[in-house]
């Protein structure tokens, strides 16, 4: 119905151990370090937006020192690398409790993102010469998805005693988007650009439960104030070569927004497993530049000759028949007198968000998020 669901407290791709984070917001979860989700240590409420993989590259013919500041209006920059030089402060955890009562929420260091929260991070960076060794960035414990964004010709960066080919940050928050997505009872997807700028590029992809792949690319984007409707039958069903088709069309869409070839390929490869191979209906859309600057204001000193910012949104959309499956599964658990919490709560990446939707559809209170 176009409403953003809360409960996005799950991390879909694990980070290496060397990534820095706020206390209680490390890359961990119910099965210990490296599990998916940090909610065990710091309770979070009303997380409707995840900022998953932003990186900042520098391209320079000469070495120089730079100061970089990124704000996050509506959210917390909770994970980063290299170590930051400054930034936001989050509440201190006095009494850690995975499931605090409302009275304990504050002492547990909880953050309610339905109230105003504006994050910020700063780095004092040494941009090294173009011929600096790429080996400087090597670290034990690097994951494949950490390596893929290095697919660029950017300068190696040094912050303190840490080296990397890019500045990395992640966040969680709650704010309105300039676009809405809904699916009507006929399973037609409706996309409306409610913002003041055109969406430069959109790509709709669906992986069905029986692993059929359907997609549609909108290379011309979506003008401000306009909408489009996509009946389920109009999503193109592909054959065994779908990966090449989807990959190439996504790369072309990103190239048209200003990314270099290396950056575009690195971005798609970083996302591939957790986004393009997973079941579900999703829409990729390039955020308009002014909206990007509004949400994530960026200041670099000295000012660069040119700045290119490409932020890609990914919206997971629930079809009515899938929602009905959630409700039916919940009813079965109730009949068997099992926990009222949704079965996938502890393990599925959208388990908490599914709980909220089931609660709305069934009229029952299930759990706090």
Language-model features: where?
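Protease-labile, long low-complexity intrinsically disordered regions enriched in Pro/Ser/Thr
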Residues: 1-369
């Amino acid at each position: 119905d176009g409403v953003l669901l809360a409960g996005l407290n799950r991390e879909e791709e694990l980070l290496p151990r060397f990534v820095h984070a706020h206390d209680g917001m490390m890359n961990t979860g119910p099965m210990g370090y490296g599990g998916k989700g940090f909610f065990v240590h710091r309770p979070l409420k009303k997380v409707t937006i995840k900022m998953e993989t932003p990186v900042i590259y520098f391209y320079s013919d000469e070495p120089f020192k730079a100061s970089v500041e990124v704000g996050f209006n509506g959210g917390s920059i909770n994970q980063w690398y290299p170590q930051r030089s400054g930034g936001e402060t989050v509440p201190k955890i006095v009494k850690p409790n995975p499931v605090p009562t409302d009275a304990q929420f504050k002492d547990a260091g909880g953050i309610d993102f339905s109230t105003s929260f504006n994050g910020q991070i700063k780095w004092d960076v040494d941009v090294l010469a173009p011929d600096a060794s790429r080996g400087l960035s090597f670290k034990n414990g690097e994951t494949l998805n950490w390596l893929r964004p290095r697919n660029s010709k950017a300068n190696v960066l040094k912050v303190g005693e840490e080296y990397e080919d890019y500045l990395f940050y992640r966040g969680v928050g709650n704010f309105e988007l300039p676009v809405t997505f809904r699916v009507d009872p006929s399973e037609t997807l409706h996309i409306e650009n409610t913002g003041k700028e055109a969406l430069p590029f959109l790509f709709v992809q669906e992986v069905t439960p029986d692993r059929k792949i359907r997609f549609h690319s909108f290379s011309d984007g979506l003008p401000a104030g306009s909408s489009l409707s996509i009946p389920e039958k109009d999503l193109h069903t592909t054959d065994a070569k779908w990966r090449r088709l989807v990959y190439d069309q996504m790369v072309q869409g990103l190239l048209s927004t200003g990314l270099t070839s290396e950056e575009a390929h690195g971005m798609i490869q970083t996302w591939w497993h957790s986004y393009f191979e997973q079941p579900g209906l999703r829409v990729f859309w390039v955020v308009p530049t002014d909206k990007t600057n509004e949400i994530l204001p960026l200041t670099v000193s000295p000012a660069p000759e040119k700045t290119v910012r490409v932020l890609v949104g990914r919206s997971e959309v629930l079809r009515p028949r899938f929602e009905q499956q959630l409700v039916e599964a919940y009813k079965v658990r109730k009949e068997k007198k099992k926990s009222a919490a949704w079965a996938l709560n502890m393990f599925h990446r959208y388990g908490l968000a599914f709980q909220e939707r089931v609660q709305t559809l069934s009229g029952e209170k299930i759990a706090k998020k």
